[in-house]
């Protein structure tokens, strides 16, 4: 079963080479009970670690069950430890956050079985601890903890059990109980190898090997070796590998348990991710809301709309800054419509602030004088009532179409149609309510009143000019030509000097404005999201720091897991899963906080915010990616720890 030849083990202590084992050769048959004794420094524990595949010899040959150990990879050694070897340690090495049955089942998570309550219960009953199945290690005596360790060593039906000073920390009663359990296991055909310094225990073995100064001093057969057993130990089947998905689910479950055991540290680790994700979701919601508001506001304008405004140029004077400032008149508007081909319709506009009163209610809002064509050009067909006509415009009729905000502030739930209001102390009859447009950032598009443009000019504002002219072009392809014709016609009508013709009138293409605003909004959204993403990266660095600390604190646990059969990838996935759990939990909480922040901003400030599914998925995915990226190094560091070095770590 075990055949070692010329085994040597040396350690380099600075410039000094220390030989611990000096050419040991021995064979151990199946079903034997071997005690290895020797004083401190004799090499007995080192020999057991090599036999148990926790350490590798510097020189020599080790054949285990017909396989040369030196030819096995690290993962193959882990599989042999898991399937064929059980360990009982002097320090018990139970995980304090787990119940007894979970500690017993721990090796199963690295096989296809996973945690098994029934198997653990049967083994705990076998070692006399069935009533302690839900107790944690700090609730048990030393003897009880060692019996749990024995049950753990049996969970995978091992061929060999290695016990390193199994009674070293126990009272005499517990010592006898543990030795009796080991004898019963040996009677069942399991090979037992015990390292001890107690002569009484050594004398109870079937074979006693004494070491001194790294060599075998004596090898004595105390009891005859029984015939080779024909038990289930000889009928082992290769266990199939676990499905990757199931394996990852178990690692994630372990990750949740670990984090639950360190709530404060886990919470602080999540905080950076939480803030970062909340900021990303909130900023993207603000940006998306602003963009959609702009799109909604401009979509009604159409891509064939031009807006003409007068510049700051003065004409007719003999000195700079003298003369009359250029204004756009109603005659200009009529001429534009009649003389420039390609124009479908025009709507002059004159606007200003107005104090509105209705009974005992007051409201200050924007008052716009527009032409009847405005209704079609700006998608402003009233949802209640009607728009004013061209006849009412020419007759300067005192009628008004109000926005939904004005209607709500002045009339509440009452219908405003037919009611009389005062605009700057002038009586107007409400004939319609405009469709709801929503907010464009801090500006409320529904907080306005439309009146006939001629009425506004002469009855409200006392002007003989308009502020701007909306011009709808029939075909988008004609827009450049119409723009040039507008500039030429207006410069000619107002006798603008050649040197000032570029500044006298401004013609805005709403399609270009819409594109520019959308581009600006997208850029702003990305800028805000990028700034927020920085906090995510900072949170990721925090996770990496915490995980590195965790690896250091749990070095002995890592050694234990490797001793009971965890491969390098198992340790890697476990710590990676823990960092993913931290980042994903932080991400989910951050998404909730970000959504709440967006709703709060929308309610308190009245800004439009939109939390899109894309932003939520992006934030969630990015938080998981942060966990993977920043958890990789600590996980890799943990996976590369050598089993025996990790177990010895203090």
From Swiss-Prot:
Alphabetic keyword roster: Antibiotic resistance, ATP-binding, Cell inner membrane, Cell membrane, Membrane, Nucleotide-binding, Translocase, Transmembrane, Transmembrane helix, Transport
Keyword Transmembrane helix recorded: yes
Record carries keyword Transport: yes
Domain of life: Bacteria
Assembly information from the UniProt record: Homodimer.
Main location: membrane
Intrachain disulfide bonds: none
Entry's family note: Belongs to the ABC transporter superfamily. Macrolide exporter (TC 3.A.1.122) family.
InterPro entries: AAA+_ATPase, ABC3_permease_C, ABC_transporter-like_ATP-bd, ABC_transporter-like_CS, MacB-like_ATP-bd, MacB_PCD, Macrolide_Exporter_MacB, P-loop_NTPase
GO molecular function terms attached to this record: ATP binding; ATP hydrolysis activity; transmembrane transporter activity
Location of the ABC transporter domain: 2-238
Compartment list: Cell inner membrane
Gene that this polypeptide is encoded by: macB
Pfam families xref list: ABC_tran (PF00005), FtsX (PF02687), MacB_PCD (PF12704)
Protein name: Macrolide export ATP-binding/permease protein MacB
Membrane topology: Multi-pass membrane protein
Role of this protein: Non-canonical ABC transporter that contains transmembrane domains (TMD), which form a pore in the inner membrane, and an ATP-binding domain (NBD), which is responsible for energy generation. Confers resistance against macrolides.
GO cellular component: plasma membrane
Amino acids binding ATP: 38-45
Any one Gene Ontology BP term: response to antibiotic
E.C. numbers: 7.6.2.-
Residue stretches spanning the membrane: 267-287, 531-551, 580-600, 610-630
């Amino acid at each position: 079963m075990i055949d070692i030849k010329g085994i040597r083990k040396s350690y380099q202590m600075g410039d000094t080479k220390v030989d611990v084992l000096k050419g040991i050769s021995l064979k151990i048959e199946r079903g034997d009970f071997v005690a290895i004794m020797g004083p401190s420094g004799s090499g007995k524990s080192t020999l057991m670690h090599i036999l148990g595949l926790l350490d590798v010899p510097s020189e020599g040959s080790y054949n285990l069950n017909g396989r040369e150990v030196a030819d096995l990879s690290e993962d193959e050694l882990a599989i042999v430890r898991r399937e064929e070897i059980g360990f009982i340690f002097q320090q018990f090495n139970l995980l304090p956050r787990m119940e007894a049955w979970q500690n017993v089942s721990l090796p199963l998570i690295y096989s296809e079985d996973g945690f098994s309550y029934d198997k653990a219960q049967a083994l705990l009953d076998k070692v006399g601890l069935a009533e302690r199945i839900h107790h944690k290690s700090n609730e048990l005596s030393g003897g009880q903890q060692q019996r749990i360790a024995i049950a753990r060593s049996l969970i995978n039906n091992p061929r060999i059990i290695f016990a390193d000073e199994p009674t070293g920390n126990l009272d005499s009663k517990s010592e006898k109980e543990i030795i009796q359990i080991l004898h019963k296991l040996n009677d069942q055909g399991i090979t037992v190898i015990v390292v001890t310094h107690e002569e009484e225990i050594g004398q109870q073995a079937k074979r006693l090997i004494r070491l001194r100064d790294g060599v075998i001093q004596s090898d004595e057969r105390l009891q005859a070796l029984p015939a080779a057993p024909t038990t289930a130990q000889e009928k082992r089947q290769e266990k199939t590998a676990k499905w990757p998905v199931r394996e990852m689910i178990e690692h994630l479950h372990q990750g949740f348990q670990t984090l639950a055991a360190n709530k404060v540290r886990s919470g602080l680790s999540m905080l950076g991710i939480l803030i970062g994700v909340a900021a990303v979701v909130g900023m993207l919601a603000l940006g998306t809301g602003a963009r959609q508001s702009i799109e909604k506001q401009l979509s009604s304008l159409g891509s064939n709309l031009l807006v003409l405004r007068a510049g700051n140029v003065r004409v007719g004077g003999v000195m700079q800054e003298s003369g009359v400032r250029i204004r756009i008149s109603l005659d200009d508007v009529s001429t534009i419509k009649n003389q420039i081909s390609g124009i479908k319709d025009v709507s002059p506009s004159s606007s200003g602030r107005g104090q509105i009163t209705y009974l005992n209610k007051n409201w200050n809002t924007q008052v716009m004088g527009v032409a009847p064509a405005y209704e079609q050009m700006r998608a402003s067909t009233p949802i209640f009532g009607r728009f004013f006509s061209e006849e009412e415009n020419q007759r300067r009729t005192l009628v008004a179409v109000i926005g939904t905000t004005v209607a709500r502030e002045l009339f509440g739930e009452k219908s405003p149609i037919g009611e009389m209001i005062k605009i700057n102390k002038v009586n107007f009859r409400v004939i319609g309510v405009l469709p709801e447009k929503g907010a464009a950032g801090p500006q409320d598009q529904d907080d306005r009143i439309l009146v006939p443009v001629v009425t506004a000019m002469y009855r409200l504002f006392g002007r003989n000019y308009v502020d701007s002219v909306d011009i709808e072009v029939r075909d988008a392809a004609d827009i450049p030509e119409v723009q040039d014709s507008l500039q030429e016609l207006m410069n000619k009508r107002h006798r603008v000097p050649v040197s000032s013709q570029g500044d006298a009138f401004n013609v805005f293409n709403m399609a270009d404005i819409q594109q520019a605003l959308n581009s600006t909004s997208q850029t702003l959204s990305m800028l805000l999201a990028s700034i927020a993403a920085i906090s995510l990266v900072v949170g990721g660095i925090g996770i990496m720091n915490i995980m590195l600390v965790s690896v250091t604190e749990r070095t002995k646990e890592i050694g234990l897991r490797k001793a009971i059969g965890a491969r390098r990838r198992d340790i890697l996935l476990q710590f990676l899963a823990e960092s993913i759990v931290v980042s994903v939990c932080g991400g989910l909480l951050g998404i909730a906080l970000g959504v709440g922040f967006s709703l709060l901003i929308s309610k308190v400030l009245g800004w439009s915010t939109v939390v899109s599914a894309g932003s939520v998925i992006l934030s969630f995915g990015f938080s998981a990616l942060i966990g993977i990226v920043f958890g990789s190094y600590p996980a890799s560091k943990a996976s590369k720890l050598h089993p025996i070095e990790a177990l010895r770590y203090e």
